């Protein structure tokens, strides 16, 4: 009996020592009396109080954000600058292409005019024309503006006074000497008119100029347009047309081949 009571007492004591208090969960005792946990808590407190807490992280984040913003603005500025330079380069390339195309066009026109000039010179030389010794005046006018008539020393003394009210183009037509050839037949002429064939129908621009006896003596060719004649008015008997046999019978000339 005593042995049984002693065993029951030991069992009761051992159960109370290793059992958790009522109402609490079963937990193991802390190792080394809880010194490790206390040291960790003290270290954590020291880590927070060492200056690397929330304020330090916030300042560092703000600096990084500001640096990223500066880099982003610089990249955007560089992108816009490169785009503007690219557009300007494309515009310059287009202008250069247009200028080069215009130069090629002018070169083709110049080559064609040179071929025409050489062809006309050969034809006139074959007919024995003295176009190299002739003198004439070329009046250059801008489109839409009245050019000033500057007489050359060769024809300044031969200008009659009745031509002062004429336009430069009419004055040039009215001041030709009867012995000088038509405009465009000189050595520096760029375009030369061809004489019409005998018996061919003439347009108003190519019709022969009607000349009077007084006009030949004064070296003045009177044109019907300068006097303002009407179409139904009859001309004086002194105005006679040139005889067909006095016209130079230039045949029809074929154009030279062009490139």
Swiss-Prot record:
Sites of Phosphoserine modification: 167, 180, 188, 255
Keyword Transcription regulation: yes
Single Gene Ontology MF annotation: protein kinase binding
Pfam families on file: INO80F (PF24245)
GO biological process, one term: chromatin remodeling
Main location: nucleus
Cellular compartments annotated: Nucleus
Record PTM Phosphothreonine, positions in chain: 172, 203
InterPro entries: INO80F, TFPT
Biased composition annotated in UniProt, kind: Polar residues: 167-178
Cross-link (Glycyl lysine isopeptide (Lys-Gly) (interchain with G-Cter in SUMO2)): 222
GO CC terms: cytoplasm; Ino80 complex; nucleoplasm; nucleus
Keywords: Apoptosis, DNA damage, DNA recombination, DNA repair, Isopeptide bond, Nucleus, Phosphoprotein, Transcription, Transcription regulation, Ubl conjugation
Annotated spans, Disordered: 50-72, 141-210
PANTHER family the record matches: TCF3 FUSION PARTNER
Assembly notes: Interacts with NOL3; translocates NOL3 into the nucleus and negatively regulated TFPT-induced cell death. Component of the chromatin remodeling INO80 complex; specifically part of a complex module associated with the N-terminus of INO80.
Function: Appears to promote apoptosis in a p53/TP53-independent manner.
Protein name: TCF3 fusion partner homolog
Source organism of this protein record: Mus musculus (Mouse)
